[in-house]
């Protein structure tokens, strides 16, 4: 059976799941982190969420559609967010948060948590 829910309801539930998992990782004392992607398919919508550089794509007869965008520190909006929080992005082999991490969103990564958020971006 199905419930009466909207893409916004699904997005909120997925976001809560990401943030709860992030908090659980941190509570365990985990220093490492993980990127995450989630795709929920309903009869009327495809709802894709991600944090980090895990990517969801949709293959159709006409080609491939990217459902998510990678969270890289060099992405203009991500770099602005990090800098607004007092952090920096350093270009080494690739753009890195505080010269270390090559993604700007992830679950865990306790040492950079101030700048590396678990809050997913969602498209529906």
Please name every model-derived segment.
Residues 1-124:
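PP2C/PPM-type serine/threonine phosphatase catalytic domain
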